[in-house]
């Protein structure tokens, strides 16, 4: 018997009545806590297949303190996150077209996109991306709030819809909150390690 293993079949098999990301030009900015896992899921949804292209953008390296909640592990320690994730995705799905840009996204040339994803969790950079890549380029912003209390996302599909800046302005006024009570301000780490917000790796895939 013949067993299908082509990219289109693998992307559509589990969601036969839904559209996939096959054939789309997608850029993922930030390959950290969220972006690492998200890039894996994007490929499983068809990104980088059937003529499409997935571009990973991150200038940061994978450090020892990242290992506990990152998609990558010790074999990629001290490697650039975008390059290491691209290598891992190609290992898992040899047919996909995945490119790494180990640079600050403000110096990157991403070209025309079908979807831009901001997974950096940095408010100021999110505002810059919204201004640089205006509608009609669809943009998905994803971030973790507090010590893993909530994972939020905002999809901008047109110029008249809600934008990232609007959401943050509402957030400062206490509107559109993810929780009824204020988010706790919890920090961990000391000495040479530096401070960080503690939450488990499972938060990144909620």
Describe each PLM feature range.
Residues 25, 53-54, 138:
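Residues at the starts of beta-strands that form the adenosine-phosphate
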Residues 34:
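Hydrophobic/small residue at the entry helix of a nucleotide-binding pocket
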Residues 114-115, 119-206:
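E1/E1-like adenylate-forming module used to activate ubiquitin-like modifiers
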């Amino acid at each position: 018997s013949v067993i299908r293993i082509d990219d289109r079949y693998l992307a559509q098999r589990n969601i036969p009545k839904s559209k996939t990301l096959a054939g789309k030009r997608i850029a993922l900015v930030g390959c950290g806590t969220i972006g690492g896992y998200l890039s894996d899921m994007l490929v499983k949804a068809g990104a980088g297949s059937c003529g499409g292209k997935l571009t990973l953008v991150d200038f940061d390296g994978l450090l020892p303190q990242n290992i506990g909640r990152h998609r990558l592990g010790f074999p990629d320690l001290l490697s650039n996150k975008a390059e290491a994730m691209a290598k891992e995705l190609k290992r898992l799905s040899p047919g996909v077209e995945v490119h790494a840009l180990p640079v600050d996204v403000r110096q990157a040339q991403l070209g025309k996109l079908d979807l831009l994803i901001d997974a950096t969790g940095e408010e100021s950079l999110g505002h810059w991306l919204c201004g640089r890549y205006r509608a009609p380029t669809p943009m998905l912003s994803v971030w973790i709030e507090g010590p893993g209390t909530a994972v939020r996302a905002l999809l901008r599909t047109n110029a008249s819809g809600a934008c990232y800046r609007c959401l943050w302005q509402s957030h400062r006024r206490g509107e559109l909150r993810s929780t009824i009570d204020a988010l706790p301000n919890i920090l961990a780490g000391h000495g040479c390690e530096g401070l960080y917000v503690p939450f488990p790796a499972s938060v990144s895939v909620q």
